[in-house]
């Protein structure tokens, strides 16, 4: 911020108020005269500023600037590790996830939090196939349990040649295909995990279509279709996972390469953040469901 010339003049005139002393500690005659003139000018200047209200405005501007600087410094401190390294969004997400996991795990047995349980969250990543890579092909599937622990994480080998890895958004690279499974094998493993369980996802029908699988509607909880989320954060339209995670969890995801594990965890956290309302609306549509364990 560049201060006005009036503010600089006020600083300069204020500095001239300091009494200059000679080596013996006595005031010089010339300095005394200068001080008298300076005090008069300062008084006239300040009186003029008070009359016009300019001085108070400048002071308010400086105070606001100091407050903004303090906010920036506070945010920088919050986003910095003890060793001075900046915390990226993935680190922050992992930190919050671990905190929430610890809150849940403290109330449950270890076998329960590590097991698959009744609730799972799934997310998929895709690569480009066909001319110019415009068509999408499944390349990774990740499933986590109610507590965010990984249940299944598979890289999938597309049947068609990959023409665009879309690494900048999918996070998929050629070397991931070294241990990739076929789509048929992936489909079988995912089907076994989903059977009899409540599936949490974001626009999950896209992922199910890519897997060529179906799942009972009464067993699906889709954060993209949850009406309270749509009304509050997207004016009734379909909100993005990134937007919901930012608005509700105060976390930034998908800033660079996507991670299907990270997205699946974020989706589960979103569901848990409004679980009671999810189930209330779901029961209105499909009728009361049997109590389920996590």
Curated annotation (Swiss-Prot):
InterPro entries: Exonuclease_RNaseT/DNA_pol3, REX4_DEDDh_dom, REXO1/3/4-like, RNaseH-like_sf, RNaseH_sf. Residues 1-56 are annotated as: Disordered. It comes from the Eukaryota. Keywords: Exonuclease, Hydrolase, Nuclease, Nucleus, rRNA processing. One of its GO terms (cellular component) is nucleus. It is an enzyme of class 3 (hydrolase). Its EC number is 3.1.-.-. SMART domains: EXOIII (SM00479). Exoribonuclease involved in ribosome biosynthesis. Involved in the processing of ITS1, the internal transcribed spacer localized between the 18S and 5.8S rRNAs. This is RNA exonuclease 4. The lineage of its organism: Eukaryota, Fungi, Dikarya, Ascomycota, Saccharomycotina.
């Amino acid at each position: 911020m560049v201060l006005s010339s009036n503010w600089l003049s006020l600083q300069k005139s204020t500095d001239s108020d300091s009494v200059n002393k000679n080596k013996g500690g006595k005031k010089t005659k010339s300095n005394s005269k200068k001080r008298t003139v300076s005090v008069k000018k300062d008084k006239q200047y300040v009186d003029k500023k008070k009359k016009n209200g300019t001085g108070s405005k400048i002071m308010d501007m400086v105070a606001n600037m100091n407050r903004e600087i303090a906010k920036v410094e506070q945010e920088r401190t919050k986003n910095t590790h003890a060793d001075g390294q900046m915390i990226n969004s993935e680190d922050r997400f992992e930190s919050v996830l671990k905190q929430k996991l610890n809150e849940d795990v403290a109330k449950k047995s270890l076998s329960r939090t590590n097991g698959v349980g009744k609730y799972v969250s799934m997310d998929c990543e895709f690569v480009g196939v066909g001319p110019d890579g415009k068509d999408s092909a499944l390349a990774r599937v990740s499933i986590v349990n109610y507590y965010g622990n990984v249940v299944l994480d598979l890289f999938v080998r597309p049947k068609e040649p990959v023409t665009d890895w879309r690494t900048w958004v999918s996070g998929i690279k050629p070397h991931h295909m070294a241990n990739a499974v076929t789509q048929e094998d992936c489909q079988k493993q995912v089907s076994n995990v989903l059977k009899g369980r409540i599936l949490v996802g974001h626009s999950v029908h896209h992922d199910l279509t890519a897997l060529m699988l179906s799942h009972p509607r009464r067993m699906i909880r889709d954060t993209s279709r949850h009406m309270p989320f749509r009304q509050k954060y997207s004016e009734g339209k379909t909100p993005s996972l990134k937007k919901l995670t930012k608005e509700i969890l105060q976390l930034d995801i998908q800033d660079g390469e996507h991670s299907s594990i990270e997205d699946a965890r974020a989706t589960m956290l979103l569901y848990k953040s409004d679980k009671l309302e999810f189930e209330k609306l779901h029961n209105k549509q499909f009728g009361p469901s049997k109590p389920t364990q996590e």
